[in-house]
UniProtKB/Swiss-Prot annotation:
Reported function: Involved in the biosynthesis of the pterocarpin phytoalexins. Acts on isoflavones with a 4'-methoxy group on the B-ring, such as biochanin A, formononetin and 2'-hydroxyformononetin. Has a low activity with daidzein and pseudobaptigenin, and no activity with the 7-O-methylated isoflavonoids isoformononetin and prunetin.
Reaction catalysed by this enzyme: formononetin + reduced [NADPH--hemoprotein reductase] + O2 = calycosin + oxidized [NADPH--hemoprotein reductase] + H2O + H(+)
Enzyme superclass (EC): oxidoreductase
GO cellular component, one term: endoplasmic reticulum membrane
Record protein name field: Isoflavone 3'-hydroxylase
TM segment ranges: 7-24
Phylogenetic classification of the source organism: Eukaryota, Viridiplantae, Streptophyta, Embryophyta, Tracheophyta
Residues engaged in binding heme: 439
PROSITE patterns referenced in this protein's UniProt entry, alphabetically: CYTOCHROME_P450
E.C. number: 1.14.14.88
Cofactor(s) named in the record: heme
Length: 501
């Protein structure tokens, strides 16, 4: 018995030594990083805003550095060349997502487009999204919806101005922009409006419930959940994050199921052209794949990724224009020349407005809606630059830092739309990601932002509240909104009266 016990002990020791040797070999030549604290690693570096924290760390440790969040290795990439290497040479290896608490509960156990790891299911979701949901033909079919919601925005601003006697009137754009983008997306998805005070909200109680769900989801997605890295904290759940995730997931699921059932029963007055209608038609021929579960995940993804981001970007664009009146003047001149002083701009006109496109590109460079790309996860060992990156490493790309790096941008912190007159400069903007997991909603975002900003410039004269420039500091939130919401003075121009529902 003693012999067998000794043999077993020896085998155990040899196995542990082999595992430690393999692990140490894998962990050799990691990117450099700050010192760690026992157990928590570098969790004390999880300070908001993360993109600024990581930019500061990159100035000490270089364009690629390591952090240990508990027992999980995180590699932060802060240069365009390394980011391109991640999503070209290592694109498939880094095409997975880490498993966080929100993915388990809110994103249907990691099965939605944004949370699923690379594989057949994700490829099918991507195909459905690009071909059936966000194709150019599909987006063109909803042009009337987007035009109507943008016109409503202009009309409400016009009403605000008229009520004050047609002179310069103080307006706050954020609530109006949020209302416009969410209503446009919900009408494309389900044919319903849930925001606004213009008497055209489909169901007041249902609308209130929807707004509460979206608000809570945004709050949870922006939460700093250390339990994702220290399992003990998840068990304790001091912040009640797990309970909140379960609760909002249940509410969201019931809400989305209700929407789908309404369409299935034909209780919603639509022409059958909404995204839900289209997906339900596909489910008739392929019910095993186009399940309610899949449809709910697609709807949720469009709402969370395609609404707040556009509203936030439009607010940043208008703020930069107010801080740079010479740029605003040049944009107005382009609209007058290319579209005409008596003709309202439309989505189809955006290709004629290169300077407006440059303004938007420069805004996305300085104020990307996702300052850190969604986290990637390595499925096997790889190298990035000269460093080893082991399997099961979380990769974070600091787009905000890359976009403001003076090594890669001339006069990097200045707002200069003219820099994008060189066509190759546009390709350096990473606001919508890179590689196979880049955001599929790029075309919709470009249409929404370009059309809305064009109309705001055409229909109103804009000024700051005072001589002092606007505060361009970012606030909290996954989409990096302005810390201080934009308040500006606007005065209606005659062409604003041509806007009709």
């Amino acid at each position: 018995a003693l012999f067998y016990y000794s043999l077993l002990s020896l085998s155990f020791i040899i196995t542990i030594k082999i595992l430690l040797k393999i692990t140490s070999r894998r962990l050799k030549n990691l990117p450099p990083g700050p010192p760690t604290i026992p157990i928590i690693g570098n969790l004390h570096h999880l300070k908001h805003p993360l993109h600024r924290t990581f930019t500061t760390l990159s100035q000490t440790y270089g364009d690629i550095f390591s952090l240990w969040f508990g027992s999980r290795l995180v590699v932060v990439v802060s240069s365009p060349s390394l980011a391109h290497e991640c999503f070209t040479k290592n694109d498939i290896i880094l095409a997975n997502r880490p498993r966080f608490l929100t993915g388990k509960y809110i994103f249907y156990n990691y099965t939605t487009l944004g949370s699923a790891s690379y594989g057949d299911h994700w490829r099918n979701l991507r195909r459905i999204t690009t071909i059936d949901v966000l194709s150019n033909n599909r987006l063109n079919s909803f042009l009337g919806v987007r035009r109507d919601e943008t016109n409503r925005l202009i009309q409400k601003l016009l009403k605000d101005v008229v009520s004050e006697g047609f002179g310069f009137t103080k307006v706050e754009l954020r609530p109006r922009l949020t209302e416009m983008t969410f209503n446009a997306m919900m009408r494309m998805i389900s044919g319903k409006r849930y925001y606004g005070d213009d008497g055209d909200v489909s169901d007041v109680e249902e609308a209130k419930q929807f707004r509460e769900i979206i608000s809570e989801m945004m709050s949870l997605l922006g939460a700093n959940n250390k339990g994702d890295f220290l399992p003990l904290l998840r068990v304790v759940d001091l912040d009640n994050l797990e309970k909140r995730c379960k609760r909002i997931a249940k509410r969201s699921n019931a809400f989305l199921e209700g929407l789908i059932e309404e369409h299935r029963r034909g209780n919603i007055h639509s022409d059958g052209g909404t995204m839900i209608d289209h997906l339900l038609k596909l489910s008739e021929s392929q019910p095993e794949y186009y399940s309610d579960h899949l449809i709910k995940g697609l709807i949720q993804g469009m709402l969370l990724a395609g609404t707040d981001t556009s509203a936030v970007t439009i607010e940043w664009v208008m703020s930069e224009l107010l801080n740079h009146p010479e740029v605003l003047k040049k944009a107005k001149e382009e609209l007058d020349t290319q579209i005409g002083k008596n003709k309202l701009v439309d989505e189809q006109d955006l290709s004629k407005l290169p300077y407006l496109q440059n303004i938007i590109s420069e805004t996305l460079r300085l104020h990307p809606p996702a300052p850190l790309l969604l986290p990637h996860y390595s499925s096997e060992d790889c190298t990035i630059g000269e460093f080893n990156v082991p399997k099961d490493t979380i990769i974070l790309t600091n787009v905000w830092g890359i976009h403001r790096d003076p090594k890669h941008w001339n006069d990097a912190l200045s707002f200069k739309p003219e820099r994008f007159e060189k066509e190759e400069e546009v390709n350096k903007v990473m606001a919508f990601g890179l590689g196979r997991r880049a955001c599929p909603g790029l075309s919709l975002a470009q249409r929404t932002v370009g059309f809305t900003v064009g109309l705001l410039i055409q229909c109103f004269e804009w000024e700051r509240e005072s001589e002092e420039k606007l505060d361009m500091m970012e606030g909290k939130g996954i989409t990096m909104p302005m810390k201080i919401p934009l308040r500006a003075m606007c005065k209606a121009l005659p062409i604003a009266n041509d806007v009709t529902k």
